[in-house]
């Protein structure tokens, strides 16, 4: 297993070893390495996505991650942290969307009143904030368990990822709704928040898989 943390624009591919001193680089255009087309994605357009293909690429032993045949296990070890990361991305984006929506509803007027004065708007804002705070606390709990190598860390990371990414998308979607038709126009940030958070429910394991992990942990106890 090798790891490539650099984009296509880089001149080298860094292939880290488990021993930092052995970290080396190979040319990004080394024989056998090829790149697919830039994918035209729904969201996350600030981050280019391409397939990287290896065809009989020679990789020095010093650049190998761990023992041969252990690639899958090494990859799985990184998933818990990745799930915390994507959950945090959802919370941050949703927080921004909520702040923008809160400001907007105090400015937008209908029927001679700011729409923030309507009880329906207030209930929506209250629910958005409550769920966002709950999601943030769940992610913090899962991160703490991961840092402390708790035996249930994987389960808590799955719960945090599932909950926070669902909440994040829902908050952004509700924020777009509060903007009305303006929320659907690219001049305003809401449509991007919705597009970007949608993939969070898929990355690092779909939220359906998170439910499988959680349920299996419950049934083992």
Task: Outline where the language-model segments fall.
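Active-site beta-strand/loop segments that form the cofactor-binding cradle
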Residues: 1-3, 64, 176-179, 183-184
